[in-house]
Amino acid sequence: MAAKDIRFGEDARTRMVRGVNVLANAVKATLGPKGRNVVLEKSFGAPTITKDGVSVAKEIELADKFENMGAQMVKEVASRTNDNAGDGTTTATVLAQALIREGAKAVAAGMNPMDLKRGIDQAVKAAVIELKNISKPTTDDKAIAQVGTISANSDESIGNIIAEAMQKVGKEGVITVEEGSGLENELDVVEGMQFDRGYLSPYFINNQQSQSADLDDPFILLHDKKISNVRDLLPVLEGVAKAGKPLLIVAEEVEGEALATLVVNTIRGIVKVVAVKAPGFGDRRKAMLEDMAVLTGGTVISEEVGLALEKATIKDLGRAKKVQVSKENTTIIDGAGDSATIEARVGQIKTQIEDTSSDYDREKLQERVAKLAGGVAVIKVGASTEIEMKEKKARVEDALHATRAAVEEGVVPGGGVALVRALVAVGNLTGANEDQTHGIQIALRAMEAPLREIVANAGEEPSVILNKVKEGTGNYGYNAANGEFGDMVEFGILDPTKVTRSALQNAASIAGLMITTEAMVADAPKKDEPAMPAGGGMGGMGGMDF
């Protein structure tokens, strides 16, 4: 086992705080509408230019191991806030720095670290309750657009496109962000349920212009096994032919004689049929077939529930207003499923989302919710260069997370004003002893830090602006973009409550751990091995003339 380098007490805390300051100073330069850019070197290709706090934090590694530990713990604040709320990483870092810096000073002055931590926790708890009281629900598209705009560093086009996407697919819908091919941002919306499987034979195409198979008011057969024998399909085909409607078959595979017969029937115009493979694999395939059954009001023909394909009737089939099948995708529009059953299914999937620990599973489950609840929107980010594209895409993703958080828990006035207003709830608190009360005071000062930093980045005097904001009430604050005072909601400067709350709670959590740290252990630097002695000359070489 390698030897360890151990630091205690003040020496440990001083080094840790130094690391915190290095990381926080780099990150907080990006805060506010007049925040600066940070350039990140890449091992290959052009450097990345960003105003995204968490992107800056993730790149920082310090040479001194003890300083690096401090930096990594603050990086954890940024990452955890980003995971919880999707935004607010810079605010969380600024809060953590303020709490740690003041806390470390108090410990150096001889105060009890545990009492300081209890005081900070007490203050944060009261502030969170006050934030929830200040919070207003987001109901209209305008508020959603404003939240997106602020999170995307005051880029209105991003805020508006996110609001439009949410309006089209609903608040439960899935919105994804991709790199576009043009200069402008674009929005593509797929309504209904779409899955990535196309027709099994090009002979099913009936719309030559779009090279797709379009079915109006079709029946939908869902089967979880292969179909290769046409006899199994005859009862269903006869029922559909009598009804005079088209048929969509979704099965694990349709092959051989069965596929050939379906193609012949389609060409001759006896029954209009399209066959596609079921999406997904294994258990996920079964779940997606069940989703389709719920959406269309049909039943999955499966031996597991005692249903055989040859015994299936027209009553077991689902219905939809329209189905479009291209070479690569199938879209079911306006399924005939019962809305209460669909809602129950969505609720069931949401429970699975809460229970799962896998990010991949969570993403797939959220996609299933979207397909049942509304649809899928794709925001294609446009830019003129690759570097701008990456920076802009990161901002769009931040803004999207922020708007989701706003829909979830509501919004508070932005620009650091909400935390200043929450001071009212904390100002009257007193701890069980003097050290706890000092911990409360540390939290009070830290909650002013985001506003101070926004003002400092805008080139103004933080104390003067802060005092003027404190004199006001409610939404009254400072718009750093144009230097005006007024109602932050009217200015359109809003922060999601969840983002502000998560930033404060996560910063206090890590700060409490760092203040109460008494020893730090790291690998001792390895001493350089002595160089090998120089080898002697080779014998028998004398007399050679060079």
UniProtKB/Swiss-Prot annotation:
Q: What's its catalytic activity?
A: ATP + H2O + a folded polypeptide = ADP + phosphate + an unfolded polypeptide
Q: Where found in the cell?
A: Cytoplasm
User: Which GO annotations describe the biological process of this protein?
Assistant: protein refolding
* The UniProt record lists the keyword Endoplasmic reticulum: no
Q: Which family does it belong to?
A: Belongs to the chaperonin (HSP60) family.
What is this protein for, i.e. what is its function? Together with its co-chaperonin GroES, plays an essential role in assisting protein folding. The GroEL-GroES system forms a nano-cage that allows encapsulation of the non-native substrate proteins and provides a physical environment optimized to promote and accelerate protein folding.
What organism is the protein native to? Xanthomonas campestris pv. campestris (strain B100)
User: What EC number(s) does this enzyme carry?
Assistant: 5.6.1.7
Gly residues composition bias: residue spans = 534-546
Protein name, per record: Chaperonin GroEL
Gene name linked to the record: groEL
Q: Where is this region: Disordered?
A: 526-546
List keywords of the entry alphabetically: ATP-binding, Chaperone, Cytoplasm, Isomerase, Nucleotide-binding
Which class of enzymes does this protein belong to? isomerase
Which Pfam families does this entry report, sorted A to Z?
Cpn60_TCP1 (PF00118)
Q: Which residues does ATP bind?
A: 30-33, 51, 87-91, 415, 479-481, 495
Quaternary assembly: Forms a cylinder of 14 subunits composed of two heptameric rings stacked back-to-back. Interacts with the co-chaperonin GroES.
Q: Which InterPro entries does UniProt cross-reference here?
A: Chaperonin_Cpn60_CS, Cpn60/GroEL, Cpn60/GroEL/TCP-1, GroEL-like_apical_dom_sf, GROEL-like_equatorial_sf, TCP-1-like_intermed_sf
Q: Which GO terms describe its molecular function?
A: ATP binding; ATP-dependent protein folding chaperone; isomerase activity; unfolded protein binding
Q: Which CDD domains match?
A: GroEL
User: Record's Gene Ontology CC terms?
Assistant: cytoplasm
Predominant location: cytoplasm
